[in-house]
Amino acid sequence: MGLTSAATDQTIHRVLSLLVPQQQPPIIPMAFTYNEYGEDIHRLFVPADDPGRSRIPSTDLVVYNTDKQLLQLQSQAAGPSPVYRDEFTLVVYIDGACRGNGTPQARASYGVYFGPGSPYNANGLLPTTVRQSSTCAEIEALAAALNTIHELCTNDLKLMFIKIATDSKFLVDAMTLHIEGWIEDGGIGSRGKKVIHYERMKELHELLDDMEYSDDGGMIVQFWHVDRSLNEGADALANAALDA
């Protein structure tokens, strides 16, 4: 579904809260990706569908802000305009790892990557009370990322447009295409069976709604499906947790 007026109002509130003029205006990430019903999927980020990023090579799209110690998107206005770092964005890479996946000895971990040497980078093992699987690891990586993102954006009102990059197509599809339908159907999937990990994903979906629509929200969080080769930072963190 598209952005609601409530989400737009909260985003405008964040913009008006900025006291320091910016050299570059924010580029609002318009949703040009649609589902089979012609509805825009506002939590899905596809650079090729974004006019502010479609002409920027993938290798140049994300840059590290050494002052803020986090990753941000590059942007480019229409025409022969220079590329500049979009100060209103935040890019976070997440990944999960599981050794012995599908066995009683399985052990899973997560990694959250904000950039090279960033103090916000995080990793850890999944609690033993949580199912040890690759899918659970990806979901818990998202949970860890959202906690840090919320804290960062609360302390820095410039950070409004959040991109969560992951190589897990399951997670991207679940959180952008399916979760609202699953909620409407009480957690039952298209095959008439309970969706695995539904309760945890519903909890994170509600957190995303709170970050977007609540009085202190105004953040627009989108999921970005990336190739594994672009997710090496988060992957390394997840595996480091297993090696420790």
Please identify what each model-predicted range represents.
Residues M1-G2:
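N-terminal targeting segments with Sec-dependent signals, encompassing both cleavable signal peptides
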Residues S5, H13-L19, F32, N101, ...:
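RNase H catalytic domain
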Residues V15-S17, P29-C136, T148-L152, A241:
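RNase H-like nuclease fold core
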Residues A236-A244:
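Short, surface-exposed amphipathic charged segments that create phosphate/polyanion-binding patches used
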